[in-house]
Structures are given as structure tokens and as C-alpha cells.
């Protein structure tokens, strides 16, 4: 019986595919170049669904996919009913607050732009600061430049995008990596297959970790 895995398009997908290959899964060499949204790998009894990163936990929660790979940022924002069973330790980055270098705290009606409104709202609430959150779907760096918001909350990996747009990081909210997530019903019904996959991936991750020391 085929196990369905939801994957985010982009960098996480490429790193997750490498991880699966390292764990012994025989995936076609043309796999990463495929433009299909559903890719079947019959020899491994696997089916891959390629979705927008924010949508991966939704596919897993509703059982359309048995398992998936999602960034911790997406997990925190979406709060879906899925089991987060393994830190894959790929696509490392962090969530941060950023602004123009001229930004000064204490403005009236402070506004923060983000594609992570729930994460941003929670963070500022914990800081005891009341802000208006403006949800954007991309190019978050535009918000301070155009005067839409004084600060942004966004993912930072190298910091190059912030730098190119003249922004500076004010504070780090938390570190982010990608996680292996499982549909609760699939976890019960297909425990053997899923545990096998988790163990194989964990062995590779632990091996990579030990090489770093």
C-alpha cells in the first residue's frame, strides 16, 4: 500500500529529497526537476504531493497525506492537528523582527507586517507590547520601506535579503528547522511503515550530527 507524503516546493523539498536518498530511498534522478504536483515512486510504494509550504500541514491533518515535511515556522503559524515526530535538522533559519536602521520604539499605534500573523501576535503579546499585525503574503521587506509598518516578522536565513533592502535585524524570535509530521490516524493504522521511515531518517540525521563534532 502506497504511503503519501506531502512536501513543500522549493529549498526544503530539495534538502528533504537528499535526506530520503541518504536514508536509502531510491528516488529517480529527475525527481527534483519534475514539474508535476503529484509524483509516484512505485518501487518504494511512495507518492509525493508537492504543495505550498503553508499548506503541507493541512494536507496531513485531513489525511490526504499520511506524512509530510514542514518548517517549524509553518507549524507554529498553522497549529494543525498533526504529530510532529522528528526534527529533520534541514533548512535551518530563524524567525526575527526587523526594521529600517532609523526605527525607534515608542511610535503611536505600532504596526508589524508578517506572513506569520499568529506567531507575530503571540510574540509581541509575550513581550507585553500591543501592536497591530498586518498580514502580507510575500515581499515583507517592502512594508517598512513604504511606511506600511514600522517592523516586520519574517524568516531570516543568511540575512542577505534584509541587507539588500536596507533593513536590520532587531531581535531573534526562535530558531527554525523542518519537521517530519504525521497524520494521527495514519500513525495508528500504518505505524510499522511510518516508524520504519522515521528510524531510517533519524539514523541519517544522527550520523550527520556526529560528523559535525
From Swiss-Prot:
Subcellular location: Cytoplasm
One Gene Ontology cellular component: cytoplasm
First-level EC class: transferase
Domain of life: Bacteria
Main location: cytoplasm
EC id: 2.4.2.17
Gene Ontology molecular-function annotations: ATP binding; ATP phosphoribosyltransferase activity
GO biological process, one term: L-histidine biosynthetic process
Pathway: Amino-acid biosynthesis; L-histidine biosynthesis; L-histidine from 5-phospho-alpha-D-ribose 1-diphosphate: step 1/9
InterPro entries reported in the protein's UniProt record: ATP_PRibTrfase_cat, ATP_PRibTrfase_CS, ATP_PRibTrfase_HisG, ATP_PRibTrfase_HisG_short
Catalyses which reaction(s): 1-(5-phospho-beta-D-ribosyl)-ATP + diphosphate = 5-phospho-alpha-D-ribose 1-diphosphate + ATP
Keywords annotated in UniProt: Amino-acid biosynthesis, ATP-binding, Cytoplasm, Glycosyltransferase, Histidine biosynthesis, Nucleotide-binding, Transferase
HAMAP family per UniProt: HisG_Short (MF_01018)
Function in brief: Catalyzes the condensation of ATP and 5-phosphoribose 1-diphosphate to form N'-(5'-phosphoribosyl)-ATP (PR-ATP). Has a crucial role in the pathway because the rate of histidine biosynthesis seems to be controlled primarily by regulation of HisG enzymatic activity.
Entry's free-text remark on domains: Lacks the C-terminal regulatory region which is replaced by HisZ.
Family: Belongs to the ATP phosphoribosyltransferase family. Short subfamily.
Quaternary state and interactors: Heteromultimer composed of HisG and HisZ subunits.
The protein's name in its UniProt record: ATP phosphoribosyltransferase
Amino acid at each position: 500500500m502506497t504511503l503519501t507524503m506531502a512536501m513543500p516546493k522549493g529549498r526544503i523539498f530539495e534538502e528533504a529529497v537528499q535526506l530520503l536518498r541518504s536514508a536509502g530511498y531510491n528516488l529517480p534522478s529527475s525527481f527534483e526537476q519534475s514539474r508535476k504536483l503529484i509524483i509516484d515512486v512505485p518501487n518504494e510504494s511512495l507518492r509525493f504531493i508537492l504543495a505550498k509550504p503553508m499548506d503541507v500541514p493541512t494536507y496531513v491533518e485531513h489525511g490526504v497525506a499520511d506524512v509530510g515535511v514542514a518548517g517549524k515556522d509553518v507549524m507554529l503559524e498553522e497549529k494543525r492537528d498533526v504529530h510532529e515526530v522528528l526534527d529533520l535538522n534541514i533548512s535551518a533559519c530563524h524567525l526575527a523582527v526587523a526594521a529600517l536602521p532609523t526605527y525607534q520604539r515608542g511610535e503611536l499605534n505600532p504596526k508589524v507586517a508578517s506572513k506569520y500573523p499568529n506567531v507575530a501576535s503571540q510574540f509581541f503579546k509575550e513581550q507585553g507590547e500591543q501592536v497591530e499585525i498586518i498580514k502580507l503574503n510575500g515581499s515583507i521587506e517592502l512594508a517598512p520601506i513604504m511606511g506600511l509598518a514600522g517592523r516586520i516578522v519574517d524568516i531570516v536565513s543568511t540575512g542577505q535579503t534584509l541587507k539588500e533592502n536596507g533593513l536590520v535585524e532587531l531581535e531573534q524570535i526562535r530558531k527554525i528547522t523542518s519537521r517530519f509530521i504525521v497524520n494521527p490516524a495514519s500513525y495508528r493504522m500504518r505505524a510499522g511503515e511510518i516508524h520504519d521511515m522515521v528510524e531510517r531518517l533519524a539514523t541519517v540525521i544522527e550520523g550527520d550530527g556526529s560528523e559535525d563534532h
